[in-house]
């Protein structure tokens, strides 16, 4: 007899539908009436706010400041950077008129709003902001003394998505995009790699997501970039999620946007630029990485509430005493800190049964649940349940011990989620040396491991193979995973030391 779960279907039965049901059960987001656009509900948005807060400090610690740039980009800006524009052309939303005019339909009697006032030059709703920020950089730069420029903006972007999936692929999504301009090529490359490292460390330490850091192949590179670096995450169905990218743009954008300056030798030079970004897609990765068949499992560092206290009041005469004690415990816990921040603690005072409350917080992924009733008051203990363990597993601990160790418990949960994810990832990456191995691994419809293979194919050969097997090269890993003894490329037979990771992806 199968064990009853809070989420139906389970991961094993239908992973894509399980993912949608976890989001629904945790009350994180929903589809809107605008196709491809989502409503991020308070619980999901609270996670995004915590992500923003941590990342924003990391950006400032690395010398960046926040700014804001226009949502609308003149088409002429995109025409200046043909390769970049072509990469986004099929995803662009275009604004062609500047007002609406009411017209009454004589046949139906209904009033329709008709676009009128055609624009002389259409605008694109930003898919990314390299061009418009580049134009600003050109205005701000005249001398090498004006460099480096290092700005970030938190905003929304628009890319028409044919197959939307909440958090993972939506037409409109929230993100941050960093843009920098430098005096030398070396400085710009250093910036690109620094921010790539920031993303890797953030994903690991805050989201408990272990990523594979690497460089994209030419075929997978950001349009207009000389180099693109990525952090790739493996989720529970073994598909890859690109969790963040950092791009070295060379002088491509500075030449098209005329970002030039008088150098130290008084000659006119073009700046070297970079850009980098992560989005609400990270929330999708978090869900798919950690959650189980009972709902969301949220790492403590981004949990909107880290501890929920559930008063158990079977008798009215003990109700007020239990509630008062729960509030006092919450105040005591909020005075404690976890990674420099006060603990986020909620007392659930709603007039609901204990079971209903418990399962709601299980499905929302709260790291620690505490139940306190009249007997617990007498004993000076609490009933503790951890979200990284089975939902019905509980332990009774002295309240004084809980207060002293609350931050340690949260760190233990954070560490457990990370180590569990590392073990899963490492058990599903394996080497392969022939094309046949690749074809066999990805031939079925079920879950497939990531394969580390020798590769020296051209962008055209890569694209053909990727299309045929419905897979992609996720990256050329940095470090040992991306290098090996000389071996024949699985497609061309040419000897190469380079190793790449092939996988299915979202």
Swiss-Prot record:
Keywords: Aminoacyl-tRNA synthetase, ATP-binding, Cytoplasm, Ligase, Nucleotide-binding, Protein biosynthesis. It is an enzyme of class 6 (ligase). It catalyses: tRNA(Pro) + L-proline + ATP = L-prolyl-tRNA(Pro) + AMP + diphosphate. InterPro entries: aa-tRNA-synt_IIb, aa-tRNA-synth_II, aa-tRNA-synth_II/BPL/LPL, Anticodon-bd, Anticodon-bd_dom_sf, Pro-tRNA-ligase_IIa_arc-type, Pro-tRNA_ligase_II_C, Pro-tRNA_synth_II. It is found in: Cytoplasm. The keyword Cytoplasm applies. GO terms for biological process: prolyl-tRNA aminoacylation. One of its GO terms (molecular function) is proline-tRNA ligase activity. Its EC number is 6.1.1.15. One of its GO terms (cellular component) is aminoacyl-tRNA synthetase multienzyme complex. Catalyzes the attachment of proline to tRNA(Pro) in a two-step reaction: proline is first activated by ATP to form Pro-AMP and then transferred to the acceptor end of tRNA(Pro). Consists of three domains: the N-terminal catalytic domain, the anticodon-binding domain and the C-terminal extension. Homodimer. Belongs to the class-II aminoacyl-tRNA synthetase family. ProS type 3 subfamily. This is Proline--tRNA ligase. It comes from Akkermansia muciniphila (strain ATCC BAA-835 / DSM 22959 / JCM 33894 / BCRC 81048 / CCUG 64013 / CIP 107961 / Muc). The lineage of its organism: Bacteria, Pseudomonadati, Verrucomicrobiota, Verrucomicrobiia, Verrucomicrobiales. The gene is proS.
């Amino acid at each position: 007899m199968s064990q009853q779960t809070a989420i139906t279907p389970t991961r094993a039965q239908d992973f894509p539908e399980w993912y949608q049901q976890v989001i629904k059960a945790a009350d994180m987001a929903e589809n809107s009436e605008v196709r491809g656009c989502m409503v991020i509900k308070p619980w999901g948005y609270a996670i995004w706010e915590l992500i923003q807060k941590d990342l924003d400090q990391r950006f400032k610690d690395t010398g960046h400041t926040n700014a804001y740039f226009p949502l609308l980009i003149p088409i002429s800006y995109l025409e200046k950077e043909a390769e970049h524009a072509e990469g986004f052309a099929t995803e662009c939303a275009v604004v062609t008129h500047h007002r609406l005019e009411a017209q009454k339909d004589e046949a139906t009697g209904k009033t329709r709003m008709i676009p009128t006032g055609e624009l002389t030059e259409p605008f694109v709703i930003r898919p990314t902001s390299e061009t418009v920020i580049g134009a600003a950089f050109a205005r701000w730069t005249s001398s090498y003394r004006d460099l480096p420029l290092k700005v970030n903006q938190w905003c929304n972007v628009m890319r028409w998505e044919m197959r939307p999936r909440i958090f993972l692929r939506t037409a409109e999504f929230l993100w941050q995009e960093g843009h920098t301009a430098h005096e030398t090529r070396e400085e710009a490359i250093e910036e690109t790699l620094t921010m790539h490292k920031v993303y890797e460390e953030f994903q690991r330490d805050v989201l408990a997501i272990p990523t594979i850091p690497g460089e994209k192949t030419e075929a997978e590179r950001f349009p207009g970039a000389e180099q693109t670096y990525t952090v790739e995450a493996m989720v529970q169905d073994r598909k890859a999620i690109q969790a963040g990218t950092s791009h070295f743009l060379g002088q491509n954008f500075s030449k098209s946007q005329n970002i030039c300056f008088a150098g130290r030798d008084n000659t006119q030079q073009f700046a070297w630029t970079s850009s980098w970004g992560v989005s609400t897609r990270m929330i999708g990765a978090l869900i798919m990485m950690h959650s189980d068949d009972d709902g969301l499992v949220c790492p403590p560092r981004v949990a909107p509430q880290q501890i929920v206290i559930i008063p158990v009041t079977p008798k009215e005469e003990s109700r007020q005493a239990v509630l008062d004690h729960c509030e006092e415990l919450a105040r005591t816990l909020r005075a404690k800190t976890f990674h420099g921040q006060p603990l986020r603690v909620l007392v659930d005072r709603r007039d609901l049964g204990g079971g209903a409350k418990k399962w709601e917080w299980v499905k929302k992924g709260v790291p620690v649940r505490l139940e306190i009733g009249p007997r617990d008051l007498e004993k000076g203990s609490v009933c503790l349940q951890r979200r990284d363990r089975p939902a019905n597993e509980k332990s009774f601990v002295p309240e004084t011990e809980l207060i002293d160790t609350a931050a340690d418990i949260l760190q233990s949960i954070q560490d457990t989620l990370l180590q569990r994810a590392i073990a899963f990832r490492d058990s599903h990456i394996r080497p392969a040396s022939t094309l046949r191995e690749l074809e066999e691994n990805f031939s079925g419809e079920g879950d497939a491991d990531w394969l580390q293979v020798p590769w020296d194919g051209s962008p055209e050969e890569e694209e053909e193979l990727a299309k045929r097997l419905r897979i992609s090269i996720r990256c050329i890993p940095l470090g040992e995973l991306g290098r090996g003894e000389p071996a024949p490329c699985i497609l061309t037979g040419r000897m190469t030391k380079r190793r790449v990771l092939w996988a299915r992806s979202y």
